[in-house]
Amino acid sequence: MKQILYKLFEHQYLGRDEARTILQNIAQGKYNDAQVASLITVFLMRNISVEELCGFRDALLEMRVPVDLSEFAPIDIVGTGGDGKNTFNISTAACFTVAGAGFPVVKHGNYGATSVSGASNVMEQHGVKFTDHTDRLRRSMEKCNIAYLHAPLFNPALKAVAPIRKALAVRTFFNMLGPLVNPVIPTYQLLGVYNLPLLRLYTYTYQESATRFAVVHSLDGYDEISLTDEFKVATCGNEKIYTPESLGFNRCRESELDGGNTPEDATRIFDAVMEGTATEAQKNVVIVNAAFAIRVICPEKPIEECIALARESLESGKARETLKKFVELNG
C-alpha cells in the first residue's frame, strides 16, 4: 500500500486493473484502517477517474454474492448519498411506490454512512430480516413485487470499510460505488448523484452497460429529485433540465425534506408518506422520483402519465399495501 499511496500523493492516477486489485485487497483485510482511510482521503481531494471507478466497480461485482432475479426485469432507485442534505428516505419510499404501481423493484441499500438513516435503517425499524438467500428474495418478488438487498451481505468490501466510513462521516468514493454494484445487475436503474461531474461519470459508465438508466441531480446539490430547484436528468445520449413548475409541482423548501435526528424520526416520516398523512412536499418528492423511475422502464410514456401512475399508487394505498405485505413476508 505504501507504493500506491506515494503514487497517488504525486497526483498520479490508478489504472483499471490496479484499482480492481486494491479493492480486492481491502476486502481481504490486507490493509490496516489507517491505510484505507489514507486511500479514501485521496479521493476526497480530487475527482475519481473513469478507469478508477470502473476498476473499483469490477472488483465489487466480481466479489459479490450473485443473485439471479433477471426474470423479473427489475428496477433499482438509488442515490449516492453524501450530499449533506439529510433528507428522509425518499428513494426507498419511491421504490415501494413503483412496486405498488405494478413494476418489479430490487432495492439495494445500506445503513446511513453520512446521514441519519439509510434504507437499511428504515427496513430494520420495520422488523425486516435481511437475507442473501435467492429463494427468499425470489419469493418476495413474486408476492410483493419488491425485494431488498442489504449491501454488506452481498459485497464483502462494503462490509469491511463500513466502520471507517462511519468514523469519517463524510462522503467517500464508496458513496459513488454503492449504486453501481447492485448484485442483481438490474435491468433498469434510476441513479441520483450529488454533483454534475459525477452525473457525467455515471452516464459515461452506464453507456457501456446493458442497463437502461437515468441519472438525476438537483442543481442545488441533492442526490435525487428534490423539487427544491431545477434538476437535470441524463440518459443514454440525452440530457434535460426540468423545473418543478413544468411538471405541475410547487417548489419545496429544504426544511420540508429533512429526515430528522434519528432513524426513528426518519422512519416516522417514511411511514407518514406511505400512510398518506405526510405533507404535500413530502408526498410530491416521492411521486416525482417514482415517476422518473417508471419513465426509465416505459420511455414511450409521457412524464405526465408516469407522474399520474406514481400518484395513484401512493394516494390509493397500493404503495402502503405493498409495504405491509413486504414487512409481513420478510419480518
Curated annotation (Swiss-Prot):
A GO term from the CC aspect: cytosol
Binding site for 5-phospho-alpha-D-ribose 1-diphosphate: 79, 82-83, 87, 89-92, 107-115, 119
Cofactor section: Mg(2+)
This protein's UniProt keywords: Amino-acid biosynthesis, Aromatic amino acid biosynthesis, Glycosyltransferase, Magnesium, Metal-binding, Transferase, Tryptophan biosynthesis
Residues bound to Mg(2+) 1: 91, 224
Family classification: Belongs to the anthranilate phosphoribosyltransferase family.
Single GO molecular function: anthranilate phosphoribosyltransferase activity
Cofactor stoichiometry and binding remark: Binds 2 magnesium ions per monomer.
Annotated binding of anthranilate 2, by residue: 165
Protein name: Anthranilate phosphoribosyltransferase
PANTHER family assigned: ANTHRANILATE PHOSPHORIBOSYLTRANSFERASE
Catalytic activity, as annotated: N-(5-phospho-beta-D-ribosyl)anthranilate + diphosphate = 5-phospho-alpha-D-ribose 1-diphosphate + anthranilate
Pathway: Amino-acid biosynthesis; L-tryptophan biosynthesis; L-tryptophan from chorismate: step 2/5
Disulfide bonds: none
UniProt source species: Bacteroides fragilis (strain ATCC 25285 / DSM 2151 / CCUG 4856 / JCM 11019 / LMG 10263 / NCTC 9343 / Onslow / VPI 2553 / EN-2)
Function: Catalyzes the transfer of the phosphoribosyl group of 5-phosphorylribose-1-pyrophosphate (PRPP) to anthranilate to yield N-(5'-phosphoribosyl)-anthranilate (PRA).
Alphabetical list of Gene3D superfamilies matching this protein: Nucleoside phosphorylase/phosphoribosyltransferase catalytic domain, Transferase, Pyrimidine Nucleoside Phosphorylase, Chain C
EC numbers for this chain: 2.4.2.18
Binding-site list for anthranilate 1: 79, 110
Sequence positions that bind Mg(2+) 2: 223-224
GO biological process: L-tryptophan biosynthetic process
Lineage: superkingdom: Bacteria
Complex and partners: Homodimer.
